[in-house]
Amino acid sequence: RESLVKHLKEGTVDIALMEEYFIEDKEIKVIETEEYPFVVVAGTEINDYKELIDVPLLKRDTMLTNKYLDQFEKMIGFNLDKRISINGSIETMKNLIKNGLGFAVLPYYSVYEEVIKGTLNVIHSFDKSEDRFQIVLIRENEDKEGISKFVDFLKNYKLNRELFSEKKIR
């Protein structure tokens, strides 16, 4: 996160999308977006949450991941002890999951396309979501046409949540 702010200030990045992160800097503008849901996703070979007991959890060390993981463990009634910490991107995690190397708790927007294509399975979708991501940019750049159009697009984009009308846990 700190490196994204650094890249913004250096001008190598115009806009950053982040999970909730408190930034106290007058040069930086932070725009909250709509809430976004989290899901438990696994490869296509996993069809039921009970199968996860022997599958490694690919875990990003974020507050939101921890929050939803705690909820999931309480709900399923067992601890997910096989854990692998991932410092890479969500794309890295998705590729590991597709190759059968684990499962993860991820924001739905990040796996939407794979779920629609059938390359990832949603094992559980969480009922309530109060979490938001942030659009972060340098204040003096907010009126630039390309940046303002992109920010407007992000503010108005609605995730297709049809999958959330399905059963919540498999």
Residues covered by each model-derived region:
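Short beta-strand->loop
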Residues: 29-39, 117-131, 141
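A late-sequence structural motif
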Residues: 123-164
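Hydrophobic residues within well-ordered alpha-helices
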Residues: 8-9, 52, 95-101, 137
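Flexible hinge/capping segments at coil-to-helix
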Residues: 28-68
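Secondary-structure junction motif
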Residues: 55-79, 160-167
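Short beta-strand-to-loop elements that line the ligand-binding cleft
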Residues: 79-89
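Central regulatory/effector-binding core of bacterial HTH transcription factors
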Residues: 1-24, 86
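A ligand-binding cleft/hinge motif common to bilobed small-molecule-binding domains
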Residues: 20-26, 90-123, 129
